[in-house]
């Protein structure tokens, strides 16, 4: 299901600040070689993440689900001076590709790439985080969410990707895991939230208590 008219998506992309050389190189490689280019952060989404980092003056960022590194690079390029992006990838092959793209970029010193199960690794990380981006196993989103919400800073924002599941959240039992996640966030008294129809759906949540 196309959630947004493809013509509108192309128009939005054409009227968005282009990729930097580093994110462009990673995105181009991903399109040609990954076998699943839709898993990478698209331009509009990457620029939205960069905007959140910029306006929030984020210094500590956590990304769960590195894939080939496009999102991590977009985040690191706009992080505040002295800041760090910690990014977690469970697939060693994806992590290897991400490492090549990160090492070839001018922001490699701002990115810490961890390889392993995010459910275990997140619990070992110290907060607070000014921005958390979830883009990993959708069935584990609630677990990731519960692990990171207590580690958000006072001004911290959590962003979860693909929460509309290509429209499957609207169709009976399909998209069950993401429907459960969306309802979980909506019912959480600790946060306010907004669900955006950007890309495949972005859930933003920020602490109020």
Where are these regions (language model features)?
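A short alpha-helical cap/connector motif
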Residues: 1-131, 138-159, 163-209
């Amino acid at each position: 299901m196309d959630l947004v008219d493809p013509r509108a998506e192309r128009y939005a992309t054409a009227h968005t600040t282009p990729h930097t050389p580093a994110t462009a190189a990673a995105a181009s490689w991903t399109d040609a070689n990954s076998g699943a280019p839709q898993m990478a952060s698209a331009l509009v989404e990457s620029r939205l993440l960069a905007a959140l980092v910029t306006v929030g003056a984020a210094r500590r960022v956590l990304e769960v689900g590195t894939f080939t590194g496009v999102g991590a690079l977009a985040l690191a390029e706009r992080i505040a001076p002295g800041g760090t992006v910690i990014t977690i990838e469970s697939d060693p092959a994806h992590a290897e590709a991400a490492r090549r793209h990160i090492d070839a970029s001018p922001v490699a010193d701002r990115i810490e790439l961890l390889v392993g199960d995010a459910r275990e690794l997140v619990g070992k990380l110290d907060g607070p985080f000014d921005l958390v981006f979830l883009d990993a196993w959708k069935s584990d989103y609630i677990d990731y969410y519960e692990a990171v919400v207590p580690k958000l800073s006072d001004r911290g924002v959590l962003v979860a990707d693909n929460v509309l599941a290509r429209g499957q959240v609207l169709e009976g039992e399909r998209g069950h895991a993401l429907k459960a996640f969306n309802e979980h966030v909506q019912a959480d008294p600790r946060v306010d939230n907004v669900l955006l129809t950007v890309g495949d759906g972005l859930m933003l949540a920020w602490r109020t208590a």
